[in-house]
Curated annotation (Swiss-Prot):
This is Fructose-1,6-bisphosphatase class 1 1. One of its GO terms (biological process) is gluconeogenesis. It is found in: Cytoplasm. Homotetramer. It comes from the Bacteria. PANTHER family: FRUCTOSE-1,6-BISPHOSPHATASE-RELATED, SEDOHEPTULOSE-1,7-BISPHOSPHATASE, CHLOROPLASTIC. Keywords: Carbohydrate metabolism, Cytoplasm, Hydrolase, Magnesium, Metal-binding. Belongs to the FBPase class 1 family. It holds the Pfam family FBPase_C. Its main location: cytoplasm. GO terms for cellular component: cytosol. Substrate binds at D119, G120, S121, S122, N210, K276.
Length: 338
């Protein structure tokens, strides 16, 4: 009986290292460690109430958001998995106010890892897809990073990815050479390549936005959504469907597969905040992935990957997905500004 040939994450990364000479061995090892940590997080997520990890932890993170037990556990899993491998100079997380330097008793490497350990955690208790988002940067200051070391434009990312913990657990990854999706084989414990060179359809009839905030949106977003909702009788002469999961990884994963636009705009409630999503560990890695898949990502005025971060937990408006739609809503913002 012949065995079905399957490409695992390890095999894929080694082949990339051999063929392109643009994937250093220590970056390959770092990605594999992050992937193993995502497997561990997936296990704890799948236990649900049986694992005593549901509910809140009685604390808040630096964003002022109530932490779930799984938020804290996922953060600890990623820290512990990556601190001793010798590939990193430091890490930063949504759940920590300051960056995490590699302890002195461990070897250090040339990379920085930035992550949202459990995106969409408000959905944990109701069993809706959640995930992990991560970004890898080179440390410009050798092995002794400061917070400034992390504040690099998204164009400087050397790898980015996300895991979705849903009906299947999948890992979507880019190292700057296209986007690939791996599905976790729970029986064998390995990530198996299931989608190669993913591409976002240019034309789309779906969009994702939290419509409950409509009364707070600025005029360019009101105009754009108004056109979509007008359907065949409106200026777009087509019917559009809205989908909103309230989990960025789930919404973006759907768009990556089916096309569409994901929007989390700034609004009038707090003009001092340019948006809700964090630039370093949400918008940047997702924008890198989307652009590698042929899509686009802006903050309404400029390409997200060109934004110079000013702080570790900086927020930004996000419009990403199928290029034609992102270009249109960005044009509305620029026309209003001018």
């Amino acid at each position: 009986m012949s065995l079905q040939r399957r490409t695992t994450l390890t095999k894929y990364l080694i082949e990339q290292q051999r063929e392109n000479n643009n994937l250093p061995a220590d970056l390959r090892l770092l990605i594999e460690v992050v992937a193993r940590a995502c497997k561990a997080i997936s296990y704890h997520v799948s236990k649900g109430a049986l694992g005593d990890a549901l509910g809140t932890a009685g604390s808040e993170n630096v964003q002022g958001e109530v932490q779930k037990k799984l938020d804290i556990l996922s953060n600890e899993i990623l820290l512990e998995a990556n601190e001793w491998g010798g590939n990193l100079a430091g890490m930063a997380s949504e759940e920590m106010e300051q960056f995490f330097p590699i302890p002195a008793n461990y070897p250090k490497g040339e990379y920085l890892l930035v992550f949202d350990p459990l995106d969409g955690s408000s959905n944990i208790d109701v069993n809706v897809s959640i995930g992990t988002i991560f970004s890898v940067l080179r440390c410009p200051d050798g092995q002794q990073p400061t917070e400034q070391s992390f504040l690099q434009k998204g164009t400087q990312q050397v790898a980015a990815g996300y895991a979705v913990y849903g009906p299947q657990t999948v890992l979507v990854l880019t190292t700057g050479n296209g986007v690939n999706c791996f599905t976790l084989d729970r029986e064998l414990g390995s990530w198996v390549l299931t989608q190669s060179d993913m591409r976002i359809p240019v034309e789309t009839r779906e969009y994702a936005i939290n419509a409950s905030n409509q009364r707070h949106w600025y005029e360019p977003v009101q105009q754009y959504i108004g056109e979509l909702n007008a359907g065949k009788d409106g200026p777009r002469q087509a019917d559009f469907n809205m989908r909103w999961i309230a989990s960025m990884v789930a919404d973006v994963h759907r768009i990556l597969n089916r096309g569409g636009i994901f929007m989390y705009p700034a609004d009038k409630r707090d003009p001092s905040k340019p948006g809700k999503l964090r630039l370093m560990y949400e918008a940047n890695p997702m924008s890198f992935i989307v652009e590698q898949a042929g899509g686009a990502a802006t903050n309404g005025e400029k390409r997200i990957l060109d934004i110079q971060p000013k702080s570790l937990h900086e927020r930004v408006a996000v419009f990403l997905g199928s290029k034609n739609e992102v270009d249109r809503v960005t044009r509305y913002h620029l026309e209003k500004k001018s």
